[in-house]
Amino acid sequence: MSFSVDVLANIAIELQRGIGHQDRFQRLITTLRQVLECDASALLRYDSRQFIPLAIDGLAKDVLGRRFALEGHPRLEAIARAGDVVRFPADSELPDPYDGLIPGQESLKVHACVGLPLFAGQNLIGALTLDGMQPDQFDVFSDEELRLIAALAAGALSNALLIEQLESQNMMPGDATPFEAVKQTQMIGLSPGMTQLKKEIEIVAASDLNVLISGETGTGKELVAKAIHEASPRAVNPLVYLNCAALPESVAESELFGHVKGAFTGAISNRSGKFEMADNGTLFLDEIGELSLALQAKLLRVLQYGDIQRVGDDRSLRVDVRVLAATNRDLREEVLAGRFRADLFHRLSVFPLSVPPLRERGDDVILLAGYFCEQCRLRLGLSRVVLSAGARNLLQHYRFPGNVRELEHAIHRAVVLARATRNGDEVILEAQHFAFPEVTLPPPEAAAVPVVKQNLREATEAFQRETIRQALAQNHHNWAACARMLETDVANLHRLAKRLGMKD
């Protein structure tokens, strides 16, 4: 088999038809999988010695949340080091990063694997990976044909990176896109709420405005603060963190503004406060709603005039600090109740951001679960950590009152439990490994079975033919995709189709 001009033209057209980078990348991956008839394909971005999935087809959804560090994935490291097409033999001793991550084939190892490194000039910017369950699945394609595919993908990714760079420098108009937020590697999520939040972060980061970040406990407000700082002109200077809820009243003022020697019992030397430490940088005040009214007044003065006084000192010090504040309270209600100053609230909330709770983020829970699974895999030295279909279903229907933090702890606990019940270094997380309160799962849909005047063999074969026809129609007559949907081996499916008279 070889690529025709029409095939290559179709791939190029799909890249142009997409609306936005994410859509173009998905069209590319989906088209490649159909053309190559492979079981799985992925486009990865290279950043800081790790590959970050941008688009996948044929892989479990949680792959989009995983971060593949080269140190833990020798096949990907081999692709990163290569300057050309990499073909891994079926008996390669290097584990495939997608083993167990092809739906319906969790217990099987990937047999055929091709890696295409993507370059912009001499710089590695990403990779295309193609995987199949048959050992010789890609033998029909020459290296030259695969290089053409890599060139198309590299061009699309390179253009996207260039546009991202220009937009971040305000050199061209346009709002941020989900792709541009990939550099915030820990802010995982493609739901509308997270996409909007990432856009707002891109907008406010370039300014010097104070930001009030609100959200329930465990939603990731600190990550939002880090993302703002890292994307701001102050990124070369420190980001200083202070948890206001953990401050005893007796030392809170000293922690914020510092003190001089002898200011109080135990002040044996001069000490800088958080504002001084954050000079020319950013100060993140977590749980700001816990500050006393007296300290709120002093904080307001700093925001108004840009100077501080150490405890026990009459002199003022000028500071240049951007303040990011976070709270899990409704500060408007706190203002009405007299527990928070209205003038401070307005100073802080020049650009308010709201972090959505996990229960409102849809499939983001699966992406985050994949990220935490990969973290556990590296930390515990496991070869793979995979979510079963039942585990994914459970995670999608649990409401997570503790949000992302609860999910992280649940994954870590489940991995430890699953590891204790299996021999070896491969872990599959099942629903029973999660200690959630009772979760009501939707019942499986019952299919109506018509009564026909056929014997059992004829009825069975008729049912098999119709099932295969429907699966083929849904997968554009891609037999590999059809086999995956039906959760059977593609070779067995071909044999069954021949026996049923559906193939020559």
Curated annotation (Swiss-Prot):
Residue numbers bearing the 4-aspartylphosphate modification: D57
**Residues that hold ATP according to the record:** 215-222, 278-287
Q: Indicate yes or no for the key word Nucleotidyltransferase.
A: no
Instruction: Write the signal peptide boundaries.
Output: none
Question: Entry's SUPFAM superfamilies?
Answer: GAF domain-like, Homeodomain-like, P-loop containing nucleoside triphosphate hydrolases
The GO terms this record gives for MF are:
ATP binding; ATP hydrolysis activity; DNA binding; DNA-binding transcription factor activity
> Is ATP-binding among this UniProt entry's keywords?
yes
- GO BP, one annotated term: phosphorelay signal transduction system
The alphabetized UniProt keywords are:
ATP-binding, DNA-binding, Nucleotide-binding, Phosphoprotein, Transcription, Transcription regulation
Its pathway is: Nitrogen metabolism; nitric oxide reduction
DNA-binding residues (ranges): 479-498
Q: What InterPro entries does UniProt report for this protein, alphabetically?
A: AAA+_ATPase (IPR003593), GAF (IPR003018), GAF-like_dom_sf (IPR029016), Homeodomain-like_sf (IPR009057), NorR (IPR023944), P-loop_NTPase (IPR027417), Sigma_54_int (IPR002078), Sigma_54_int_dom_ATP-bd_1 (IPR025662)
Known Gene3D superfamilies for this protein?
Answer: 1.10.8.60, 3.30.450.40, Homeodomain-like, P-loop containing nucleotide triphosphate hydrolases
Which Pfam family, any one of them, does this sequence belong to? GAF
Any idea where the Sigma-54 factor interaction domain is?
Answer: 187-416
NCBIfam families, per the entry: PRK05022.1 (NF003451)
- PANTHER family listed in its UniProt record: ANAEROBIC NITRIC OXIDE REDUCTASE TRANSCRIPTION REGULATOR NORR (PTHR32071:SF35), TRANSCRIPTIONAL REGULATORY PROTEIN (PTHR32071)
Biological function: Required for the expression of anaerobic nitric oxide (NO) reductase, acts as a transcriptional activator for at least the norVW operon. Activation also requires sigma-54.
Give the protein name, as stated in the record.
Anaerobic nitric oxide reductase transcription regulator NorR
Q: Which organism is it from?
A: Escherichia coli (strain ATCC 8739 / DSM 1576 / NBRC 3972 / NCIMB 8545 / WDCM 00012 / Crooks)
